[in-house]
Every structure is written in C-alpha cells, then in structure tokens.
Amino acid sequence: MVDLLLIGLGGSIGAILRYTLTKKIGERYQGDWPLATFLINIIGSFGLGLLYGFKLNQVIWLLLGTGFFGGFTTFSTYIYEAIFLMEEGLFWKNVNYLLTSIFTGVVFFAAGMWLANFFKGGV
C-alpha cells in the first residue's frame, strides 16, 4: 500500500509540473513543432537517467522514478502529437520529431547516468 501512495504522490506532482510547463512553454512558443512535450521528455530522460545512475533505494525509486518521472514524461502525448503532425500533412516534420525525440531521450538518459556516476566518483 505504501508503494502505491509513493507512486501516486510522485505521479501527481510530475503531472502537475508537466501541465504547468506545457502551458508556460505554449505561451512563449507558437510553432507547429511539439516543443513542450519534446523538452519535458528530454528533461525527464535526463532526470530518470540521473536517478538510475545513483542507484538509490526502492522508496526513492518508486516516488521519483516510477511516480514523478512517470507522471512528468508522456509517451501518449508524444504519439498523439506525431499523429497530429501526420494529419496536418507535415510528414518530414513528424519524422524529425519522432527520431529526434528518441535519439535525444537516449542521449540525455545516458548523460544523467554519467553525471550520477561522476558524482559518486565512478567516472
């Protein structure tokens, strides 16, 4: 039961932060590329990589890894925006968005792991 509470607490905070950042970025950026979701997923990938690299205890992992970053990042929105770009006839912009998001997510996850290892003295 405690596990579910930790995940729920972290997830709700992550989802609220994602919503807030999406609104703030949307107020400043009016382009046709899904910048908010892209940035949020990059930040989330980095943070999750950092958390993973520190190999913290299960309680922190459930609160932050599964909960917070699970609520903060969003695969469903990523797919929705890709489909939307396709429906708008923006094929190459869609391909760019999909590939850039995947590549950048992997790079930022690895960067987070590297930074965690650096701080632990393992690099």
UniProtKB/Swiss-Prot annotation:
Pfam families: CRCB
Keywords (A to Z) from UniProt: Cell membrane, Ion channel, Ion transport, Membrane, Metal-binding, Sodium, Transmembrane, Transmembrane helix, Transport
Superkingdom assignment: Bacteria
Binding site for Na(+): G70, T73
This protein's GO CC annotations: plasma membrane
Reactions listed under catalytic activity: fluoride(in) = fluoride(out)
Annotated compartments: Cell membrane
GO MF terms held by the record: fluoride channel activity; metal ion binding
Activity regulation behaviour: Na(+) is not transported, but it plays an essential structural role and its presence is essential for fluoride channel function.
Gene Ontology biological process: cellular detoxification of fluoride
Keyword Transport: yes
Its membrane topology: Multi-pass membrane protein
Spans through the membrane: 1-21, 34-54, 59-79, 99-119
Matching PANTHER family: FLUORIDE EXPORT PROTEIN 1-RELATED
Family assignment from sequence similarity: Belongs to the fluoride channel Fluc/FEX (TC 1.A.43) family.
Role summary: Fluoride-specific ion channel. Important for reducing fluoride concentration in the cell, thus reducing its toxicity.
Protein name: Fluoride-specific ion channel FluC 1
Gene: fluC1
